[in-house]
């Protein structure tokens, strides 16, 4: 009889970062500025790469694709956050919730693989510079980008598809600022063990595989740089990798802290902050990390501005 009286939940409520009424307007302004800078930075970088023929090379095609993934990651989360800051209705349908997670998850996974192929590009450029034009053609670069996005979309599609096997009747409140799939498992009436197991297996494989590939690539790169006799050559080689290495460190460093905080039972607010950095701050920083000290990007910007 109790089973019959259960009401199935079809809409969820996102609690957001805080329920304090006095903070809603200031937070809206802060995250609106962050979101606008993120879009201008990433979409501007994409437009610059598309517009300037000097940047039609593999590394910048990868960089443009990374900028697109960052813009999509930020948009999938921040746009709904901004609406919720000003709206009293924080309701979200199951379909919209699944869609939000799908686009966030697919672009986050894509970014893992884009960082790997960018490291491979740097490996070929530094370890085999004479073969670089042959090995890293624009067509191969396009294939790498396509494969990265395909894996990202497929990975998210699997988890979103399995999400619809669950029913929700305990609560419709998600104590988070976006539809994070693990938060949905907490309020599921159906046993989510299969879903959790598959997320752990897929995520562990993707993150360990991509991280170890990055470690191996940079081990070879570092070895090749240290073998260079010219200090100027070593300095130039380090500078070509520094931006990517910083981006990788931020990306996987945040993932590591998110994992440690979840395993140690840290406060929910602390977990939110790590997730906030991963979903909103990294997409904000990336275009500036790759652009501010990049002579080719700055020169391209000057050429466009002169026109």
UniProtKB/Swiss-Prot annotation:
It is a multi-pass membrane protein. InterPro entries: GPCR_Rhodpsn, GPCR_Rhodpsn_7TM, Olfact_rcpt. GO terms for molecular function: G protein-coupled receptor activity; odorant binding; olfactory receptor activity. Residues 1-28, 78-99, 165-195, 261-271 are extracellular. Gene3D superfamilies: Rhodopsin 7-helix transmembrane proteins. It is found in: Cell membrane. One of its GO terms (cellular component) is plasma membrane. It comes from the Eukaryota. It comes from Homo sapiens. Residues 50-56, 121-143, 217-239, 293-307 are cytoplasmic. Belongs to the G-protein coupled receptor 1 family. The chain crosses the membrane at residues 29-49, 57-77, 100-120, 144-164, 196-216, 240-260, 272-292. Disulfide bonds join 97-179. CDD domains: 7tmA_OR5H-like (cd15409). Its main location: membrane. Coiled coil: none annotated. The keyword Ribosomal protein does not apply. Odorant receptor. This is Olfactory receptor 5AC1. Keywords: Cell membrane, Disulfide bond, G-protein coupled receptor, Membrane, Olfaction, Receptor, Sensory transduction, Transducer, Transmembrane, Transmembrane helix.
